[in-house]
């Protein structure tokens, strides 16, 4: 019998961002996503184990209480309105002339409107818009316009702006100016997100002399989440019963089969899933799995497995409004559970030659999903948290007056297939009793297919609204944010108390990304969303997100090095160089890998 508990506490504060300021300022956040988080996390894991060797039984109880509290912070100071207008080179005289009825500066806009009405080419209108803006803000960059839009979204404008046309000042001009000059008055209160997680698992195991054993148990988990953004409380309960039977035959063949039945609910939705049994629906969802492992010879193993999968959307995916890295997570009450199955066939072979020994493994896998849950990035109306999916939606957002948000919403992909193979080897070469080389090499090939892409493309080809969101950046058959090939190698040379190691990571290009970021389809001229992307994601010296991604969405490899020494039994030091070759790479749009980084680490064991 043994029992005890583990306790963890973590407090951190960090800045992160999902959208860059521009291709020329890739490591600076966009003003729309200038956010970080500070958080405190506490966890206690009690456990109790009792084993009776004479009866071949064991009882295990595991528990967990987890609490987290975090809130949004701004890691960098937002620019003031005077700084923004100064950076844009604002021509006050031009603004005064317009107020006095001299519209010469707006001539490019008027010309563009006339050309657009005659040619129906959006580029004529947009050239006129930006031509007039250049007269007012001659030094402005796309990032400066983002600063201005972000400032207006945060501070608002005086009411009764329409009265200026009649020579009347807004009635709340003085309070508004006071807020501009004293921005601390406009700071929003801290909005803290809190999460409570209670978990309990009981497991019973019985072994027989003939090589059979059975494992069964019960699991209960209760989660309570408070959103500081919407001031809503959501609760979920997950109850599961499981059983697995294992049998070994002839000292070579091991067979296992198991079933798990789950009940899940959120708030008052007591039946998140149903299963029909003898014509009646019960609120439990069973999943099955089975596998076998056969020892062909010494250090040679053949394995096969099959398992069903079922996952209910989490509270965050379905109900919460949350900011992560400055990008909002928006609720989708219609997201459904994802389900599927996975099959794998593998072969593992041990080898030894002199001082070299290790294992090689080859496996093929196939996974199929129905209603697979994926996130989709887009623009959202902060008034009702809905996705902006048309010009009408955008107009409604402007009327609501709470601005727009950039974020992600979880939704279902009707059908997905992911299959491929994995080859790996790991082992050790011993030079002498003081020196050895450890290695781990692995290659993965994946085909991540959207099985319904043709049907979706046919539907998207009927879209006529210029702001209607499509699923991904191209018409291809692949799922978003997945490469086809990846390779990883880890080497560690150990000599007495010294170790020298290296990591090599290689990945192929990304196959597709979100439509809001890029549209890789061929077109005769830019559409409205291309201009929206140009403002939101910036441009620098003619470089846009699209051109940057086209240049950097390629195969890439990174190399990390480390050197360590164990000074005493309790104290060890390690010096690391990450991205040794200072490779510039991008693993998703606006996510540029960290440059060469030096890290010093000390480990102390008590």
Where are these regions (language model features)?
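Outer-membrane beta-barrel channels and translocator barrels
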Residues: 2, 51-56, 209-211, 248-254, ...
């Amino acid at each position: 019998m043994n029992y005890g508990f583990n306790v963890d506490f973590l407090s951190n504060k960090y800045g992160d961002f999902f959208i860059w300021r521009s291709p020329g300022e890739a490591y600076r956040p966009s003003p729309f996503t200038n956010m970080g988080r500070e958080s405190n996390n506490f966890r206690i894991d009690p456990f109790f184990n009792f084993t009776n060797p004479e009866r071949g039984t064991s009882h295990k109880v595991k528990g967990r209480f987890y609490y987290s509290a975090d809130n949004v912070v701004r890691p960098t100071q937002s620019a003031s309105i005077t700084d923004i207008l100064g950076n844009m080179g604002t021509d006050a005289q031009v603004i005064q002339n317009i107020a006095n009825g001299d519209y010469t500066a707006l001539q490019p806009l008027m010309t563009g409107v006339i050309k657009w009405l005659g040619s129906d080419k959006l580029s004529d209108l947009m050239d006129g818009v930006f031509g007039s803006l250049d007269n007012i803000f001659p030094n402005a960059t796309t990032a400066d316009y983002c600063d201005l839009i972000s400032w207006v979204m945060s501070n608002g404008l005086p009411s009764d702006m329409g009265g200026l046309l009649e020579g009347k000042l807004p009635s709340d001009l003085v309070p508004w100016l006071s807020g501009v000059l004293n921005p601390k008055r406009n700071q929003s209160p801290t909005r803290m997100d809190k999460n409570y997680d209670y978990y309990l698992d009981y497991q019973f195991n019985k072994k027989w002399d003939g090589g059979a054993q059975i494992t069964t148990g019960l699991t209960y988990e209760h989660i309570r989440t408070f959103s500081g953004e919407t001031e809503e409380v959501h609760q979920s309960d997950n109850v599961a019963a499981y059983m697995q039977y294992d049998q070994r035959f002839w000292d070579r063949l091991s067979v296992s089969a198991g079933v798990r039945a789950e009940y899940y609910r959120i708030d008052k939705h007591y039946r998140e899933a149903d299963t029909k049994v003898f014509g009646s629906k019960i609120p439990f969802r069973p999943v099955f799995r089975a596998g076998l492992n056969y020892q062909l010879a010494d250090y040679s193993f053949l394995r096969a497995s099959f398992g069903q999968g079922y996952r209910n959307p989490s509270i965050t995916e379905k109900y919460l409004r949350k900011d992560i890295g400055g990008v909002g997570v928006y609720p989708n009450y219609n997201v459904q559970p994802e389900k599927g199955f996975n099959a794998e066939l593998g072969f593992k072979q041990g080898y030894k030659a002199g001082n070299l020994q290790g294992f090689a493994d080859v496996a093929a896998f196939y996974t199929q999903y129905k209603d697979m849950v994926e996130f989709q990035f887009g623009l959202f109306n902060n008034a009702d948290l809905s996705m902006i999916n048309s010009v009408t939606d955008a107009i409604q957002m402007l009327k609501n007056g709470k601005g727009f948000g950039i974020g992600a919403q979880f939704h279902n992909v009707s059908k997905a297939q992911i299959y491929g193979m994995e080859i790996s080897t790991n082992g050790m070469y011993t030079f002498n009793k003081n020196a050895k080389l450890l290695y781990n090499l692995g290659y993965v090939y994946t085909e991540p297919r959207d099985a319904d892409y043709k049907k979706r493309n046919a539907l998207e080809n009927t879209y006529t609204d210029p702001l209607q969101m499509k699923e991904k950046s191209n018409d291809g058959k692949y799922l978003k944010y997945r490469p086809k090939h990846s390779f990883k190698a880890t080497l560690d040379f150990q000599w007495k108390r010294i170790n020298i190691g290296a990591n090599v990571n290689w990945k192929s290009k990304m196959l597709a990304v979100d439509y809001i970021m890029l549209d890789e389809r061929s077109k005769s001229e830019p559409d409205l969303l291309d201009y929206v992307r140009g403002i939101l994601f910036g441009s620098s010296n003619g470089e846009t997100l699209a051109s940057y991604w086209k240049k950097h969405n390629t195969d890439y490899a990174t190399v990390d090095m480390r050197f360590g020494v164990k000074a005493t039994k309790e104290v060890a030091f390690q010096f690391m160089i990450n991205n040794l070759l200072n490779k510039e790479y991008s693993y998703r749009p606006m996510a540029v890998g960290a440059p060469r980084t030096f890290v010093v680490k000390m480990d102390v064991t008590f």
